[in-house]
Amino acid sequence: MALAAARRLLLHAGSRLGRREAVDGARRFANKRVLVETEGPAGVAVMKLRNPPVNSLSLECLTEFTISLEKLENDKSIRGVILTSECPGIFSAGLDLLEMYGRNPAHYAEYWKNVQELWLRLYTSNMILVSAINGASPAGGCLLALCCDYRVMADNPKYTIGLNESLLGIVAPFWFKDMYVNTIGHREAERALQLGTLFSPAEALKVGVVDEVVPEDQVHSKARSVMTKWLAIPDHSRQLTKNMMRKATADNLIKQREADIQNFTSFISKDSIQKSLHMYLEKLKQKKG
């Protein structure tokens, strides 16, 4: 309950959260974990995740992300957003496992509600969303990219992307699955979800997880050129088409939100799942050590 109240307070204070300043004709506002730079005449904002070391989507990060996105949605001068990372070598490691391990059911429910909220806002946004994937993008990081209208990925063999939840001993929910199927087709999604496949840039391009792979130093310039192409389309026709393509998938979650939260809370609270998460987190500690 306290978490929910804190989030409502932050959202209510969204217009005051973070600092605003003008930089070389551009406007910017920043929260602790998200930096947004906007270019008024161009109608484009660049949203940078900066939650080091790996841009994990903690409850605080999800809240700040949602607030930043809400600000941009309410700014009628902004037509498109380029989503990228400020952390070297990582786009986003996805959901924060520490939010799903060793907590109480109320925390799990609140966390999952925030994950749902961010996904719905991204996936149904009227703005043009282009992801400049400049690092590794597993699990929830891949989810963020899949929400975008176009995905540009750096051609670096060290970077991978995919919904690899099964490798962690957890299951991607139905709305992750639905979006994956929409993007790469049923058979590819079925195989990738069961195996927890992390695709190299070339493999991701081949199956359709990303739309373009470019040299690492060209990711942002390519994202901008792609954005220019999309901005040439009248907003009303593009937005109606996007809504037509995505509404059924979004509605499928909307009508089952509470049940999905209950299912997640029940699943993640199981001793066997907590044990799997513990083992995975211990492996991560050993790698860091």
Swiss-Prot record:
What InterPro entries is this protein classified in?
ClpP/crotonase-like_dom_sf, Enoyl-CoA_hyd/isom_CS, Enoyl-CoA_hydra/iso
Give the matching SUPFAM superfamilies. Answer: ClpP/crotonase
Pathway membership: Lipid metabolism; fatty acid beta-oxidation
Q: Quote the transit peptide annotation as a residue range.
A: 1-28
Q: What class of enzyme is it?
A: isomerase
Q: What's this chain's function? A: Key enzyme of fatty acid beta-oxidation. Able to isomerize both 3-cis (3Z) and 3-trans (3E) double bonds into the 2-trans (2E) form in a range of enoyl-CoA species, with a preference for (3Z)-enoyl-CoAs over (3E)-enoyl-CoAs. The catalytic efficiency of this enzyme is not affected by the fatty acyl chain length.
Q: What is this protein called?
A: Enoyl-CoA delta isomerase 1, mitochondrial
- Organism listed in the record: Mus musculus
Q: What lineage does UniProt assign to this protein's organism?
A: Eukaryota, Metazoa, Chordata, Craniata, Vertebrata
User: Gene name?
Assistant: Eci1
